[in-house]
């Protein structure tokens, strides 16, 4: 089959080489955007008198026919035509004849593909933003149910200090809020039109770039044509933001995996988000959480791959840039699906509140409370720290906890200790008293929830 760019060439190409160079297997995802870009471009050509209005109307009608066929899955693409742009042009030629060749006036595939990617990513990021907003709602709703649910807080995966489970959930709410802000902020760099940059230097035709940008819903145009066709920062920024978002999902999934284990039993995932074993009938595995954790590395790989492709490219277009799409498509799909599954897991999981709270009774996470108690009695904190540390060692040797120590023994250690120490050492009191701004105290959690709801 004759190539649309074949005038310069005499030799015939070979099918296996065509297959290697073709991108239609994946860039056909942008068929809708390619048709939209072409409709805007031909409208601009007609408006500016670059082609006759009658021909612009004929091309427009042909493109709309292709849009209808695309919607019904009736368009067939070929690797012979390499990419989505040449496939669309070939199909348009079959619909309306040689006038289709005028569509590419004042346009290059360089600005055409960049336009497609801006359009595609803009819509896809908008959908991810909506899913992220939904996840934040789910977290707030779950947190509201567990303001007074007590759990161990960890450092080094060792019991550190007791927390409200709501406080833990709201920590992730803060992370996902920053993810949301990053994605929303990045839209202004996606929402720029490269259309009209042509190959790299602009065009001699009297085009109106602002008009085509307006038709496509872009808020601005690239000020430099060379930058317009060369820029892939907007994709790297999306991949970077996605990597951070997936990292947050992965950290929470790691905790869910631990919490569902027999050793923890803090939560139970519903059957929909779990799988069994082919040999061990008792197993209920947190596969969806594990997959999100695993797919985080995949998203990181897409970011590093894109950075590596771009690091040595001179301006402007190079065929290497064909490698900018698959990682973007894969990341979009991975992030979208991961968000939806994760929100479902959190929304439907059962929280074993009694087991969580019991876990804080069988540890020394109240040791800081005893040290603070002594400090408030006038004992220098470092001295209090030393006293409590020795007492913890004594307790571990005797197989008891701080709340099991007799008052008489406490008073031998320091006569300032009174009977109220047992109230102080309760995990609920420990949580309730941490009412510094942003702390885990119940009053602070309620304030945090109200503030969070204002941002939903």
Swiss-Prot record:
Its EC number is 4.3.2.1. SUPFAM superfamilies: L-aspartase-like. Signal peptide: none annotated. It catalyses: 2-(N(omega)-L-arginino)succinate = fumarate + L-arginine. The keyword Lyase applies. GO terms for cellular component: cytosol. InterPro entries: Arg_succ_lyase_C, Argininosuccinate_lyase, Fumarase/histidase_N, Fumarate_lyase_CS, Fumarate_lyase_fam, Fumarate_lyase_N, L-Aspartase-like. It comes from the Bacteria. Pathway: Amino-acid biosynthesis; L-arginine biosynthesis; L-arginine from L-ornithine and carbamoyl phosphate: step 3/3. GO terms for biological process: arginine biosynthetic process via ornithine; L-arginine biosynthetic process. Pfam families: ASL_C2, Lyase_1. It is found in: Cytoplasm. GO terms for molecular function: argininosuccinate lyase activity. Keywords: Amino-acid biosynthesis, Arginine biosynthesis, Cytoplasm, Lyase. Belongs to the lyase 1 family. Argininosuccinate lyase subfamily. HAMAP family: Arg_succ_lyase (MF_00006). This is Argininosuccinate lyase. It comes from Listeria monocytogenes serovar 1/2a (strain ATCC BAA-679 / EGD-e).
């Amino acid at each position: 089959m004759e190539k649309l760019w074949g005038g310069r060439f005499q030799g015939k190409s070979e099918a296996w080489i065509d297959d290697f160079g073709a991108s239609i297997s994946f860039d056909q995802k942008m068929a809708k955007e390619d048709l939209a870009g072409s409709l805007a471009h031909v409208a601009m050509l007609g408006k500016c008198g670059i082609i006759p209005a009658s021909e612009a109307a004929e091309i427009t009608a042909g493109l709309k026919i292709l849009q209808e066929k695309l919607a019904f899955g009736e368009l067939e693409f070929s690797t012979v035509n390499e990419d989505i742009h040449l496939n669309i042009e070939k199909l348009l030629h079959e619909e309306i004849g040689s006038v289709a060749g005028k569509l590419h006036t004042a346009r290059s595939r360089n600005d055409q593909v960049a336009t497609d990617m801006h359009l595609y990513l803009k819509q896809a990021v908008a959908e991810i933003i909506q899913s992220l907003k939904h996840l934040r709602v789910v977290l707030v709703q779950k947190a509201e149910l567990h303001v007074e649910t007590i759990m161990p807080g960890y450092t080094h995966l060792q019991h550190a200090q007791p927390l409200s489970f709501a406080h833990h959930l709201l920590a992730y709410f803060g992370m996902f809020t920053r993810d949301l802000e990053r994605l929303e902020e990045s839209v202004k760099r996606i929402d720029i039109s490269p259309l009209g940059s042509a190959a790299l230097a602009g065009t001699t035709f009297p085009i109106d770039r602002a008009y085509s940008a307006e038709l496509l819903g872009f808020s601005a145009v690239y000020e430099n044509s060379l930058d317009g066709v060369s820029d892939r920062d907007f994709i790297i920024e999306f991949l970077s933001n996605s990597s951070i978002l997936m990292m947050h999902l992965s950290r929470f999934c790691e905790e869910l995996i631990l919490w569902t284990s027999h050793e923890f039993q803090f939560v139970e995932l519903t059957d929909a988000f779990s799988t069994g074993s082919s040999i061990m009938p008792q197993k209920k595995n947190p596969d969806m959480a594990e997959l999100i954790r695993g797919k985080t590395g995949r998203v990181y790989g897409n970011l590093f791959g894109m950075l590596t492709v771009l690091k040595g490219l001179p301006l402007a277009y190079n065929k290497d840039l064909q490698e900018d799409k698959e990682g973007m498509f894969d990341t979009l799909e991975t992030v979208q699906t991961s968000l939806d599954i994760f929100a479902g897991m959190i929304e439907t999981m059962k929280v074993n509140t009694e087991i969580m709270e019991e876990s804080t009774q069988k540890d020394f996470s109240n040791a800081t409370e005893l040290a603070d108690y002594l400090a408030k009695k006038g004992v220098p904190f470092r001295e209090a720290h030393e006293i409590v540390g020795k007492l913890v060692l004594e307790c571990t040797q005797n197989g008891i906890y701080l709340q099991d120590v007799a008052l008489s023994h406490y008073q031998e250690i320091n006569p300032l200790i009174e009977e109220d120490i047992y109230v102080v050492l309760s995990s609920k009191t420990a949580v309730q008293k941490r009412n510094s701004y942003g702390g885990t105290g119940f009053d602070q959690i309620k304030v945090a929830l109200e503030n969070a709801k204002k941002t939903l």
